[in-house]
Amino acid sequence: MISSPCAQKSTILIVDDDEDMRFLATVVFEDAGIAVAGEAKDGPEALTRLDELDPPPVPTVVLLDNQMPTMTGLEVAARILSDRPEQIIILFSAFLDPDVIAEAERLGIAACVSKREATNLPAIVRRVVASRT
């Protein structure tokens, strides 16, 4: 598969407490030519990984599950965006109710994606990254 130039330089940090979902997302991104910069199983680990991957712009996108132990994806996003307002975040959740979507928009999260759309993630990442460059 031929990737777009913006996808080739994009990197992803996948944050999800479900190991199978992290694996699926990794396969989907790698098959599309998008590099996975790392994985995290919860919010605190995601924040640590971002510090390890510093300086920005690595990763280009943080893919965040919303329902995780310790911190929700929205809580993690708020922490990330307070330190890195330019960070592109995609909220990826099985449960996207209107309140979650409204809070995501308020925080500046780039997109909210249902887990049922996992195979569409590369196209969504390309679109979001292209809109920010």
Task: Report each predicted region and the residues it spans.
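Non-catalytic signal-transmission and effector/linker regions of two-component phosphorelay proteins
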Residues: 1-11, 119-133
